[in-house]
Amino acid sequence: MQKFTLHKGLVAPMDRENVDTDAIIPKQFLKSIKKTGFGPNLFDEWRYLDQPGQPGVPESARKPNPDFVLNQPRYAGASILLARKNFGCGSSREHAPWALDQYGFRAIIAPSFADIFFNNSFKNGLLPIVLPEATVSQLFDEVHAFPGYELTVDLERQVIVRAQGAEIPFEVNAFRKYCLLNGFDDIGLTLRQADKIRAFEAERLATKPWLAHTMPA
């Protein structure tokens, strides 16, 4: 998993409440057995006019919706998503943070997130940041007012730095912060204990050798 320490990026405003995971990545794109390739279909039903979108159709063959925020030139290359309350509600599909990450987003700022989406984001290197609703609304005003609006997210110091230098503090669980700073997903954390796991398996097979044998068919 990619480390997250400090990130400066262009902000895109998703000015909708209750954005659910089916809007983030529609169900027909979940058939893949791979963990990659979801970025082109992020927000598919809003992002393209030719609906319903289908797996396997190249992005170049689609008809973009010019009114959708991510298709507007001023937000091209955005890596920080500014959202409204209850972002990521709906089903528990882990494909939602995968799609956001593979599109290029590193952080999402909102007044609140659905619990499962919130947890899945941390496990996939995407930083969800909860701020007071009034602060989020102020950021929306600034993004709309200033083209090319950027923020710097400093995870180590737990602050968001505005362009003019003003800082907005945010809270993050200490263990989740540790994992993001070091790029540890669940597998990475487990592999840090590889020596202990091997020692346990060796001791187990030495004292209970019958466990090494398979049952007859």
Swiss-Prot record:
Keywords: Amino-acid biosynthesis, Branched-chain amino acid biosynthesis, Leucine biosynthesis, Lyase
Gene Ontology CC annotation, any one: 3-isopropylmalate dehydratase complex
Enzyme kind, highest EC tier: lyase
Keyword Lyase tagged: yes
Coiled-coil stretches noted in the UniProt entry, renumbered to this chain: none
InterPro entries: 3-IsopropMal_deHydase_ssu, Aconitase/3IPM_dehydase_swvl, AconitaseA/IPMdHydase_ssu_swvl, IPMI_Swivel, LeuD
Gene Ontology terms, MF aspect: 3-isopropylmalate dehydratase activity
GO terms under biological process: L-leucine biosynthetic process
PANTHER family: 3-ISOPROPYLMALATE DEHYDRATASE SMALL SUBUNIT, 3-ISOPROPYLMALATE DEHYDRATASE SMALL SUBUNIT 2-RELATED-RELATED
Protein's name according to its UniProt entry: 3-isopropylmalate dehydratase small subunit
Gene name, Swiss-Prot/TrEMBL: leuD
